Every structure is written in C-alpha cells, then in structure tokens.
Amino acid sequence: MFSFFVLAHSFLTCVIVTPHASVFEKQQRRKVWQAVLLQDTFLTVLLSLPPSATHTDVSVEDLLDEDCSIASSDPTDTAYIRASWSLANLVQETICSPRSLDLPICGTARHKSKLVADFRAVYRSFPDVFRSWDSDSLDHLARTDPRVVRQTLFLTSNYFHNLMLVHASESPEVPVNVRGTLEAGHDAITAFFMLYNLLETEARVWWVFNHRAFLEALCIGNVLRETAKEAGGRDLIDRDPLFVRSKADIGEYLSNMCRQMGVADRVL
C-alpha cells in the first residue's frame, strides 16, 4: 500500500502540470491528486508512517465550482472535498511530518495553543451541513441522503481524531491536555457510533473508520488509567461528568465490538 502511494505521487507530480489541458481535464487530475493526498495523509496518521504526498503546486482553491468540474452536479461534494483537503494539509504539516522525524507534535505550550487554534479555524471553515447536526437530524438524513451522512461523519471523525492527538501529545515542556483529549476523543468516537447505528452494514467494512475508533478508545482508556494513578483520581473518574462520559464511551465501544464478533456483553 505504501509503495502505491509513492508511485502515485511520482506519477501525479509529472502529469499534474499540464498547461495545455482543458479545464475539465485539469479538474480530473486535481481530483485524483486530492484522493491520493487524503488517503496518504490519513493512513500515515493511523500507521505512523512518513507522508509521501508532500510536494505539490495544487491548492484547495484550484478546485472549481464551474460547470466543467466533475463535481459540479452536487455542491456538497465539492464542499466536502475542500474541507477534507484543508484538514489533510494541516494534519500532514503538523502531525504526520513531526512524527516521521520522531519529533514532538508540540514543542512548547504556546505551540500547542496555536496548533489547537489552527485546527479550530479549519473546523470553522467547514460548511454548516458538516458541523450543525445531531443524532435526530442525521437519522432523518440517513433515510433521504445517506451520502451526506457519510461525508459528515467521516469529516467529523477525521477532524476530532487529529485534534485528540494534538491534545494528547506531550513533550518535556508540554503535558497532556487531559480534558481536551477526552472532549475530542468523545466527539471522534461518537461519529463512529453514529455511523454504526445508522449505516451498520457499511460501518462493519470501513477499516479506516474502525481502526480510528480503536485508537480513540485506546487513547481515552490511557488517559483514564493515568488519571486513576493520581491522588484523588479514582474519585474524579467516578464523579466528574467528563470522565464518567469517557468511561461510558469505552463501554459502548467494547459492547459494539462484542456485537460485531457475536460475543455476549457479559464476558466483559
């Protein structure tokens, strides 16, 4: 899989610069590049590999809304691509690259604050359709437009998973932001629960989504474990609403996995 991305990157680096191609052809090439960039970036996050799709002269703004665009039939598709592309650019630069060099994601507390602000700015740039939702609205949308549901949940999962990694990052000068990690982890894993509840058959086969949820549960569990070691930590976990909710997230994830494997919850 990794070699595929290297080859795809080499191929696209050669062919994306086509000054005499039609606008439609250029858009097709941009769409292919965008797909490679997204797959490469978000898989390198999960697999802790160095990113390979890092050199390009193509920007998010190059994706057009004109009639010649292959996504022009549905503006929501173009909005989803732009949002995913913007997020991928930020993740590649701030998470994938430091990890590949064995560097901390955040070297100072000020750096971490700026990085969180950068992620929130990207999130604010997402169209309302991908941000302003609840379980009831998605349940209704799943019956009328499941494509938008998939886009919403995939984008939500991707965003909050990477924000969780930023909050959970630590270095000699920067501790883990416990509450920030649990908040982002909850939002990320909730997207997985929603996908499973609304589109169960699809949720079972999306490896990337399932693996992200596993890593989110693991991160939440690690935070709870470390908190329990501190003085008064167990009482905090039992009484603080944020920690109680995080424990419930772990329980729901384990129950979900048991159902997928056909194992009774009582074994837990």
Pin down the residues of each PLM region:
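Extended, leucine-rich alpha-helical cores of fungal transcription factors
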Residues: 1-57, 70-121, 139-226, 236-244, ...
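Short linear/disordered segments characteristic of secreted peptide precursors
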Residues: 65-67
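Long, charged, mostly alpha-helical binding arms that flank functional sites
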Residues: 121-129
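Long, charged, glycine-rich C-terminal linkers/tails
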Residues: 129-142
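TPR/TPR-like (Sel1-like) alpha-helical repeat modules
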Residues: 248-258
